[in-house]
């Protein structure tokens, strides 16, 4: 139902609703920080690309420790970036799963659905189909105990200073 594309502000409403549910569950254990370039709020993005990323971050960053922090950033630098950073440790198994999930080559589903990781795989696939191979989702450990999921999209129209 509805348009497959929404504004960032609408997408953030989904995320906020989801974060609200999480705050009910985790209370003080979860801290969320946002750093969002307000001038980008009317940029178009595919519906429901952020929530699975936030969900993944919480699952890895908060579930497994006494408390966790998530930072959500949205900014433009020639392209549009939506980032979710969480504190957490990536095991070798995580790295392997992630690289398998994100290296989708257009072929069969295999067994990802039962791994419950369909969210991040789907996001990456949708972005590549919609915008081309150079765009999509990456997830990497950027420092010990810090994991960054980054969605890169084309900017839908000139906005702010893009030559930053």
Report each predicted region and the residues it spans.
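C-terminal end segment of the histidine kinase catalytic
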Residues: 142-164
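Two-component histidine phosphotransfer core
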Residues: 1-140, 146-148
